[in-house]
């Protein structure tokens, strides 16, 4: 026989494997039995334990009693080192995280070209988080219109505003605008405009704000940018449903373990029976051969 397995959720102590433990049946006293059931199921576990009625086959191991054993003074199991399936893990500032989602900076691409008549053009990437501009060689994607601005710092600010506008209203039509970019501030941009006009105080440029990535909106949680995987929950799954599923899975695993041990025991018993039958057949054959030898 495989022995008894502890019926406490998350505990898989077995009387056949754990020889040093004691296993106790639920008491017959209604009040004491109710206390046992309440403690074992951790305040009403959903799933199988929501309608759990213990029988003689359900045992609680001595690990859940103070001192490691049930006694006259210690009659109720109170030690549960493993977290129950209905016990929520406290998460630090979980409410704060939901109210203020931590977005990654969305990158908006700025296409800087010369005014009509100029052939040079550059593509810059403007990051909303740090307002950094880098040279890139990408193509134009989603468009977002911005107002006329003057100076490189104004371009950054207006572009960030355009990113927010694009996030709220979707992708708008791309528009070309003329700006005056201060050459004295273009050391971080490192443009390829090497005309004589670039040595002056300002340079006439044409800017098109385009974007490669959608900007996550505040009302979208979790963010659609997060890649899905096989263990992720759907948006409609509640914590209670997930806990119920986990509890059912644990009960199924515990049941499967018991069934596997029963099968192993049955296989062992069949092997012993097979050996006995072979021995009996051998003995019968021996008894048949003995009279024939004597007669000869």
Curated annotation (Swiss-Prot):
Subcellular location as annotated: Nucleus
**Gene Ontology molecular function terms on file:** DNA binding; zinc ion binding
Q: What Pfam families does the record tag this protein with?
A: THAP
Q: Which InterPro entries match?
A: THAP_Znf
Instruction: Read off the CDD domains from this record.
Output: cc_THAP11_C
Q: Which domain of life is it from?
A: Eukaryota
What are the alphabetically sorted keywords of the record?
Answer: Coiled coil, DNA-binding, Metal-binding, Nucleus, Repressor, Transcription, Transcription regulation, Zinc, Zinc-finger
Where are zinc fingers of the kind THAP-type found along the chain? 6-64
Q: Can you cite an annotated GO cellular component? A: nucleus
Which portions of this protein are annotated as coiled-coil regions? 240-281
Family, per the entry? Belongs to the THAP11 family.
In UniProt terms, what function does this protein have? Answer: Transcriptional repressor that plays a central role for embryogenesis and the pluripotency of embryonic stem (ES) cells. Sequence-specific DNA-binding factor that represses gene expression in pluripotent ES cells by directly binding to key genetic loci and recruiting epigenetic modifiers.
Q: What name goes with this protein?
A: THAP domain-containing protein 11
What species was this sequence derived from?
A: Xenopus tropicalis
Source lineage: Eukaryota, Metazoa, Chordata, Craniata, Vertebrata
Coding gene? thap11
């Amino acid at each position: 026989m495989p022995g008894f397995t502890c019926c406490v959720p998350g505990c898989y102590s077995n009387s056949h494997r754990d020889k040093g433990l004691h296993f106790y049946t639920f008491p017959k006293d209604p009040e004491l039995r109710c206390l046992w059931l309440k403690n074992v199921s951790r305040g009403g576990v959903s799933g199988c334990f929501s309608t759990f009625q213990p029988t003689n086959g359900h045992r609680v191991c001595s690990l859940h009693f103070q001192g490691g054993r049930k006694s006259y003074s210690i009659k109720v199991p109170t030690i549960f080192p493993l977290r129950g399936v209905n016990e929520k893990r406290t998460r630090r500032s979980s409410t704060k995280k939901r109210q203020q989602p931590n977005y990654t900076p969305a990158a908006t691409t700025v296409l800087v070209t010369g005014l009509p008549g100029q052939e040079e053009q550059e593509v810059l990437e403007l990051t909303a988080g740090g307002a950094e501009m880098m040279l890139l060689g990408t193509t134009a994607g989603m468009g977002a219109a911005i107002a006329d601005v003057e100076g490189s710092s104004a371009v950054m600010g207006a572009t960030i505003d355009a990113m927010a506008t694009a996030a709220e209203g979707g992708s708008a039509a791309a528009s070309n605008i003329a700006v005056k970019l201060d050459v004295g501030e273009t050391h971080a941009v490192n443009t390829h405009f090497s005309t004589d006009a670039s040595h002056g105080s300002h340079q006439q440029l044409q800017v098109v704000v385009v974007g490669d990535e959608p900007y996550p909106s505040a009302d979208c949680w979790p963010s659609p940018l997060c890649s899905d995987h096989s263990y992720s929950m759907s948006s409609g799954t509640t914590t209670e449903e997930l806990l119920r599923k986990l509890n059912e899975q644990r009960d199924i695993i515990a049941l499967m373990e018991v069934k596997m041990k029963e099968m192993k025991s049955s296989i062992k018993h069949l092997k012993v029976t097979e050996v006995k039958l072979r021995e009996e057949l051998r003995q019968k054959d021996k008894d048949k051969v003995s009279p024939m030898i004597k007669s000869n």
